């Protein structure tokens, strides 16, 4: 034997029906050492251990091999009389399936139970009382199993599952034998089972639970399978009575069984209803398998056969008898698949919810759930079909609808895009500071409209004045635009967000700004306070930049003064001065009145929200009238304390020093009320007052420290420029090492000139300052690109309509940034419809070669304000023939540019009447024409003058003189009160009484 010798691993695995890996793992777990190789040797001990361990698996393999003989079963059926072992083997397989056809509960117990009780035929009688107790339909099939055939099958039952093979043998015999012979005997038992049906149905069900709960009562199960053989025995007794009916009523027998079961189960509780469902589904399943049995009676005719209800013991067996062909083939035709009870179960319990056939009982039991689910599925399918545009009936309609929906969606998307573009068109992307002219160009409106809107709102702005975020928002809102401020991120915010510890705050000096009209004595007042001669050093005696000074009063308290220009060109400077100040002093001359710049200064102070003190100057002059000034101020809603208002007022004389100390006391009083404090221990922050370029020192920035302490070596960031503080000096030129709050000073070390009004702050690292500076430069470049306007067709048409449009290109250079702004504003205001001023470039510092080259390329003139060109730039300008105009007073620069513009204007042609001639007689001369004898009544008539003939006040002819004679001599002119002869070129219809008027066209210089 194979067991006595060494075997290979693959052979053992095949024999035991187990995988090699399973064998190796099992042996390894038991301590055997074996290689994972199909050719590895298995010792006798190993094999004995494995065969004992996997005995069941080997048994299954044997059974499977026996099952494969199904093909021989067809030929072996002829020997059914002897009941060869082959038949029992098939019967076993079939019986397993039949038992499985019964409810799933009964399947498991039936297989083991079949061994003992095949011979006893009296078992059915003993079971009937038990059945009466139980009334269970499912085990009716089991009761039917008690038949003599079981005795013959004892041997086969012992080897495998017992009763099942017997059934199949009985079924197979009629299949191969002549159908008439075999069919007759089994048909007879069907009527008898009808009578027994009620009896067997009830006991069968009762036995089923017993079989399930207890394996020892094997007697019950043999009863189930032996009754199959009982069928021939019972028919033998009743053959004469119902043989004919059996033949004729094969279907009726099945139908009757179904009728009996269906009503009983409907009346029975839910459990019975479920069995009915199983029956119905088995019927449907039979019909489905009928395809294999094609020629024979449809398997669906005996659905009760697979049905384990057993109410009709003949039901399942007769089904095997009558539809012998169909049933064995239906169930056993493919035994391999359904052998593990899958065949019967499939049509039964598992498939119950998915059964397709029409089942009245099933429909009633689960009508709501299934119908609802189906409806839901239908709805979902219909909806999906609509969405996908599919369908056969309405395909074209759906496709058309889909195209329509698609077009609609595209139209909606396009509309949304246009709406977004319109919204973007109404959105301005600006930095926090932008000039009024740039803002106007972004909004595509005239700068005059912007200025007029601002004046209507009480804001005084100039063309190049830099507007802050609040002003930009207000102005843009007036024109219907939304403002989107572009910043470089949170890290570049110079606002001091952190709250200072109150314990670290100290008193600081008040920052006082002196504002007022030109020549009203602002600088003289500051001069007296500083005990110096500031005015004497100023060009033209007017202030042209913001001066910042720190003054110590007689009481020992410091005050920081800012002196602003009063000229209208310095509007932006005054606005900046009001923003960084604590208190504003408005200076008004007592011998003058409240002037436009005075009103503007008052407005700036109000916008900044700072307290105002009125100083009425020049009261020592004879024409001084302080009451008149107070009255005019009241018209501007400035009511002084003397008149019951809230504004302090002091009459002073800056020259004589009258009232100066009282004025300072009032300033200190306001400062005390404001409780001005600052933290000197943090990094410094402040504002840029002015910036200039010094040839020897580089960029010099005037700053005012608002909080913290600025020290030499600090990294500061101001606008788009940064640098390390190299030196600091105060207004007197004294070098400082550090500067505390409210201290004005000059700082050296920035890499550029920041714009006046920019905030500065001390950064931790130079890298951080450089990154933020580069981001700000990028924003400014983007903004300048957006604000740059190119010529449009409308503009070209406008210029052509004017006919003589001209453009004046100017490059502005000045000593400080504030002067650059003021001069640029003033020059831009000179633009007219015919002549447009273009500021190509403006900057701080001396004139360089690059400025000359730019002027040469663009045909521009250079206006220099308090700066001079370098030596190389001067030589290049002479070579390129570029005109450089240098000024020290802003008035002179403005006036000369205005004159240049007037020179660019086309002269206006005017008609001048030189003389009048009265026609007193008319002579017609051959070959000459008509000659008029005339008298010069007024003026002088010259030979080359143009003339017009006037008759009754109507001009009849305009032309030139053909001949002018006095007596016989041709003359060049005829004066008043002289007679002459005159003929007109190309006109002979001269009549007595006509007037001839001599005139000429003259060019008249135009003015702006």
UniProtKB/Swiss-Prot annotation:
<dbReference type="InterPro" id="IPR044145">
    <property type="entry name" value="IF2_II"/>
</dbReference>
<feature type="domain" description="tr-type G">
    <location>
        <begin position="507"/>
        <end position="677"/>
    </location>
</feature>
<dbReference type="InterPro" id="IPR006847">
    <property type="entry name" value="IF2_N"/>
</dbReference>
<dbReference type="InterPro" id="IPR009000">
    <property type="entry name" value="Transl_B-barrel_sf"/>
</dbReference>
<feature type="region of interest" description="G3">
    <location>
        <begin position="563"/>
        <end position="566"/>
    </location>
</feature>
<keyword id="KW-0342">GTP-binding</keyword>
<protein>
    <recommendedName>
        <fullName>Translation initiation factor IF-2</fullName>
    </recommendedName>
</protein>
<comment type="similarity">
    <text>Belongs to the TRAFAC class translation factor GTPase superfamily. Classic translation factor GTPase family. IF-2 subfamily.</text>
</comment>
<dbReference type="InterPro" id="IPR036925">
    <property type="entry name" value="TIF_IF2_dom3_sf"/>
</dbReference>
<feature type="binding site">
    <location>
        <begin position="617"/>
        <end position="620"/>
    </location>
    <ligand>
        <name>GTP</name>
    </ligand>
</feature>
<dbReference type="Pfam" id="PF04760">
    <property type="entry name" value="IF2_N"/>
</dbReference>
<dbReference type="GO" id="GO:0005525">
    <property type="term" value="F:GTP binding"/>
</dbReference>
<dbReference type="GO" id="GO:0003743">
    <property type="term" value="F:translation initiation factor activity"/>
</dbReference>
<feature type="compositionally biased region" description="Basic and acidic residues">
    <location>
        <begin position="365"/>
        <end position="381"/>
    </location>
</feature>
<dbReference type="InterPro" id="IPR000795">
    <property type="entry name" value="T_Tr_GTP-bd_dom"/>
</dbReference>
<feature type="compositionally biased region" description="Basic and acidic residues">
    <location>
        <begin position="189"/>
        <end position="213"/>
    </location>
</feature>
<feature type="compositionally biased region" description="Low complexity">
    <location>
        <begin position="294"/>
        <end position="329"/>
    </location>
</feature>
<feature type="region of interest" description="Disordered">
    <location>
        <begin position="253"/>
        <end position="405"/>
    </location>
</feature>
<dbReference type="InterPro" id="IPR004161">
    <property type="entry name" value="EFTu-like_2"/>
</dbReference>
<dbReference type="Pfam" id="PF03144">
    <property type="entry name" value="GTP_EFTU_D2"/>
</dbReference>
<feature type="region of interest" description="G5">
    <location>
        <begin position="653"/>
        <end position="655"/>
    </location>
</feature>
<dbReference type="Pfam" id="PF00009">
    <property type="entry name" value="GTP_EFTU"/>
</dbReference>
<feature type="region of interest" description="G2">
    <location>
        <begin position="541"/>
        <end position="545"/>
    </location>
</feature>
<keyword id="KW-0963">Cytoplasm</keyword>
<feature type="region of interest" description="G4">
    <location>
        <begin position="617"/>
        <end position="620"/>
    </location>
</feature>
<dbReference type="InterPro" id="IPR005225">
    <property type="entry name" value="Small_GTP-bd"/>
</dbReference>
<feature type="region of interest" description="G1">
    <location>
        <begin position="516"/>
        <end position="523"/>
    </location>
</feature>
<keyword id="KW-0547">Nucleotide-binding</keyword>
<dbReference type="Pfam" id="PF11987">
    <property type="entry name" value="IF-2"/>
</dbReference>
<feature type="compositionally biased region" description="Basic and acidic residues">
    <location>
        <begin position="153"/>
        <end position="180"/>
    </location>
</feature>
<feature type="binding site">
    <location>
        <begin position="563"/>
        <end position="567"/>
    </location>
    <ligand>
        <name>GTP</name>
    </ligand>
</feature>
<feature type="region of interest" description="Disordered">
    <location>
        <begin position="153"/>
        <end position="235"/>
    </location>
</feature>
<dbReference type="InterPro" id="IPR028626">
    <property type="entry name" value="Ribosomal_eS28_CS"/>
</dbReference>
<comment type="function">
    <text>One of the essential components for the initiation of protein synthesis. Protects formylmethionyl-tRNA from spontaneous hydrolysis and promotes its binding to the 30S ribosomal subunits. Also involved in the hydrolysis of GTP during the formation of the 70S ribosomal complex.</text>
</comment>
<dbReference type="GO" id="GO:0003924">
    <property type="term" value="F:GTPase activity"/>
</dbReference>
<dbReference type="InterPro" id="IPR015760">
    <property type="entry name" value="TIF_IF2"/>
</dbReference>
<feature type="compositionally biased region" description="Low complexity">
    <location>
        <begin position="342"/>
        <end position="358"/>
    </location>
</feature>
<dbReference type="InterPro" id="IPR027417">
    <property type="entry name" value="P-loop_NTPase"/>
</dbReference>
<dbReference type="GO" id="GO:0005737">
    <property type="term" value="C:cytoplasm"/>
</dbReference>
<dbReference type="InterPro" id="IPR023115">
    <property type="entry name" value="TIF_IF2_dom3"/>
</dbReference>
<keyword id="KW-0396">Initiation factor</keyword>
<keyword id="KW-0648">Protein biosynthesis</keyword>
